[in-house]
């Protein structure tokens, strides 16, 4: 699958995860609705499903990974930043096929696309601290 299709999958996963975080609706229902409403012709749909469902299902575990490295309480994080961090931490912890630097760079790009003006710097700072704990060999 092309890297652009994976990038689009990450973008869609952040949007679906954001929706789930706000609505607390069923994970599968949001996925079905999201895929029905979006043009997914340029999306790696299987990767989207893995990222979204994996990040949502493992949200508490992912939150525990990031919490010690946040400059504020987890509850004070914006929904976009939380979604981006959850996707990145899911990739770092569960998708060993994704290179370390790719996961971090993609998260920064997602924050630039969807987050507040300076959120990409915050995301980078958190991931720079937590990623070596997840992947000590930086691979």
UniProtKB/Swiss-Prot annotation:
Keyword Membrane: no
Keyword terms of this UniProt record: RNA-binding, Transcription, Transcription antitermination, Transcription regulation
One GO MF term attached to the UniProt entry: RNA binding
UniProt keyword Nucleotidyltransferase, yes or no: no
Gene3D superfamilies: NusB-like (1.10.940.10)
GO cellular component: cytosol
Tree of life domain: Bacteria
GO BP term (any one): DNA-templated transcription termination
Described purpose of this protein according to its UniProt entry: Involved in transcription antitermination. Required for transcription of ribosomal RNA (rRNA) genes. Binds specifically to the boxA antiterminator sequence of the ribosomal RNA (rrn) operons.
Family: Belongs to the NusB family.
PANTHER family recorded: ANTITERMINATION NUSB DOMAIN-CONTAINING PROTEIN (PTHR11078:SF3), N UTILIZATION SUBSTANCE PROTEIN B-RELATED (PTHR11078)
Name listed for the protein in its UniProt record: Transcription antitermination protein NusB
Species whose genome carries this gene: Sodalis glossinidius (strain morsitans)
């Amino acid at each position: 699958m092309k890297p652009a299709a994976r990038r689009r999958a990450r973008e869609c996963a952040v949007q679906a995860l954001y929706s789930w975080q706000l609505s607390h609706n069923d994970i599968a229902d949001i996925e079905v609705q999201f895929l029905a409403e979006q043009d997914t012709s340029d999306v790696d749909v299987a990767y989207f499903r893995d990222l979204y469902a994996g990040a949502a299902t493992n949200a508490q575990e992912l939150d525990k990974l990031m919490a010690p490295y946040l400059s504020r309480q987890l509850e004070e994080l914006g929904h976009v930043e939380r979604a981006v961090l959850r996707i990145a931490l899911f990739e770092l912890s569960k998708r060993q096929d994704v290179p370390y630097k790719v996961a971090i760079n993609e998260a920064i790009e997602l924050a630039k696309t969807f987050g507040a003006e300076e959120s990409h710097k915050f995301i980078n700072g958190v991931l720079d601290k937590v990623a070596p704990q997840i992947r000590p060999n930086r691979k």
